[in-house]
């Protein structure tokens, strides 16, 4: 039995998430609440921790306070055993500047790699919804002998132009890596599907260090992992693709096997929530064998009084539904829905309040939003357009702390 390799986890969590505005007006994209009890970063951290990768650096930058606080309060590991999940903002070790890209974030944090001296480094994104056992991908990488392994998910070729696409040969060696091509390549075994990059990579340590240092010296580079580092290694013949559909997560069902969602737009974020409240959701939050860990607040249970009800909904701890109707919605913790109010097809984040006889439909309410008595959101889009953001799909998004 071979010795387990020494693996360091690096999570790229500096994303601004402009397409999710106003949800990212006051927080980094990985800190956006999701699913009634989580933040987006909880999915990647859960995957790494479940795989027993317990030395993790989270590289942060944009409006990172809520993200830093969430990690420090909810992701404490045993320091006695050398385990840690630590947020790392730009240290400005190489001069008075912030990160200029995801590759530059690693370049400015090379001291963390030198200190840990790992055999391999997993570099994962922080803002996707999925389950994955990264240990299987690391084993695949070691067996392949490649310098970098790129996780790829199969999508219909007709839908692949919105993503970074992978062209691989029959052996899995990546021949080309192209961002948003007009003509996406097929996979070796299926010309109707395309491997799309998940933004998850496994590197042999020396290969990553050499590529990062060379990129830092390139004045023409954008210093981006997907846009610069991976194409550089592809050109050198050092990159292979890992087929995400081969990843077997304990407790997974046929429906949620290889589930992965980029929730970087309001519509994608909303649709992923609506899946959660369906009778048979594609993504199962209740897989106890591969749990997603989230907020650990000590809150009272949700309460329904005076005939209040919730149907096909997720309702977070500490919430109170009083003589109100909630349908097809996700309510986070400490949400109050008052007498006579109606909430339908909506995503309500922690601490929000929907007043007496108010109506909220097809909407996303950020933290601590207050909808006053008799007010309506998502009913008159022309009126809402004057006050709030509205997605291409007609979802009304109300920013943090707004009183209506």
UniProtKB/Swiss-Prot annotation:
GO MF term list: ATP binding; glucose-1-phosphate adenylyltransferase activity
CDD domains per record: ADP_Glucose_PP, LbH_G1P_AT_C
Sorted UniProt keywords: ATP-binding, Carbohydrate metabolism, Glycogen biosynthesis, Glycogen metabolism, Nucleotide-binding, Nucleotidyltransferase, Transferase
Top class in the EC scheme: transferase
Catalytic activity: alpha-D-glucose 1-phosphate + ATP + H(+) = ADP-alpha-D-glucose + diphosphate
InterPro entries with a match to the protein in the record: ADP-Glc_PPase, ADP_Glu_pyroP_CS, GlgC_bac, GlmU/GlgC-like_hexapep, NTP_transferase_dom, Nucleotide-diphossugar_trans, Trimer_LpxA-like_sf
PROSITE patterns assigned: ADP_GLC_PYROPHOSPH_1, ADP_GLC_PYROPHOSPH_2, ADP_GLC_PYROPHOSPH_3
Chain residues that bind alpha-D-glucose 1-phosphate: 99, 164, 179-180, 197
A single BP term in Gene Ontology: glycogen biosynthetic process
Superkingdom, natural source: Bacteria
Enzyme Commission (EC) number: 2.7.7.27
Pathway participation: Capsule biogenesis; capsule polysaccharide biosynthesis; Glycan biosynthesis; glycogen biosynthesis
Record's function text: Involved in the biosynthesis of ADP-glucose, a building block, required in the biosynthesis of maltose-1-phosphate (M1P) and in the elongation reactions to produce linear alpha-1,4-glucans. Catalyzes the reaction between ATP and alpha-D-glucose 1-phosphate (G1P) to produce pyrophosphate and ADP-Glc.
Family statement: Belongs to the bacterial/plant glucose-1-phosphate adenylyltransferase family.
This protein's name: Glucose-1-phosphate adenylyltransferase
Gene encoding the protein: glgC
């Amino acid at each position: 039995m071979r010795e387990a390799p020494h693996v360091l986890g690096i999570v790229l969590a500096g994303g601004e998430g402009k397409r999710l505005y106003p949800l990212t007006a006051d927080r980094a994209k990985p800190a956006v609440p999701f699913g009634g009890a989580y933040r987006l970063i909880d999915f990647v951290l859960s995957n790494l921790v479940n795989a027993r990768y317990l030395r993790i650096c989270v590289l942060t930058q944009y409006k990172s306070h809520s993200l830093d606080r969430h990690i420090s309060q909810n992701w404490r590991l045993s320091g006695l055993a050398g385990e840690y999940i630590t947020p790392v903002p730009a240290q400005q070790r190489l001069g008075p500047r912030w990160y200029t890209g995801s590759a530059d974030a690693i370049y400015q944090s090379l001291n963390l790699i030198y200190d840990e001296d790992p055999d391999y480094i997993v570099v994962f994104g922080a803002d996707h919804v999925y389950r994955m056992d990264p240990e299987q991908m690391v084993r695949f990488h070691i067996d392949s002998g490649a310098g970098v392994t790129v996780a790829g998910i199969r999508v219909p070729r007709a839908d692949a132009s919105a993503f970074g696409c992978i062209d691989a040969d029959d052996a899995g060696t990546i021949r080309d890596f192209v961002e948003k091509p007009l003509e996406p390549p097929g996979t070796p075994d299926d010309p109707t599907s395309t491997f799309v990059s998940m933004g998850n990579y496994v590197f042999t340590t020396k290969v990553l260090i050499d590529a990062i240092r060379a990129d830092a010296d390139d004045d023409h580079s954008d210093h981006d992992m997907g846009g610069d580092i991976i194409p550089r290694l592809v050109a050198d013949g050092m990159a292979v693709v890992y087929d995400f559909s081969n990843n077997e997560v304990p407790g997974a069902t046929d429906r949620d096997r290889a589930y992965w969602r980029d929730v970087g737009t309001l519509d994608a974020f909303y649709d992923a929530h609506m899946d959660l409240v369906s009778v048979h959701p594609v993504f199962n939050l209740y897989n106890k064998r591969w749990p997603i860990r989230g907020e650990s607040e000590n809150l009272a249970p949700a309460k329904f009084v005076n005939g209040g009800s919730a149907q096909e909904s997720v309702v977070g701890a500490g919430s109170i539904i009083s003589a109100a109707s909630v349908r097809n919605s996700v309510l986070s913790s400490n949400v109050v829905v008052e007498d006579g109010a109606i909430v339908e097809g909506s995503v309500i984040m922690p601490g929000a309040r929907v007043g007496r006889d108010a109506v909220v439909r097809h909407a996303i309410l950020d933290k601590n939003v207050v909808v006053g008595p008799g007010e309506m959101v998502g009913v008159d889009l022309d009126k809402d357009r004057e006050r709030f953001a509205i997605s291409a799909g007609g979802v009304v998004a109300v920013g943090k702390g707004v009183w209506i």
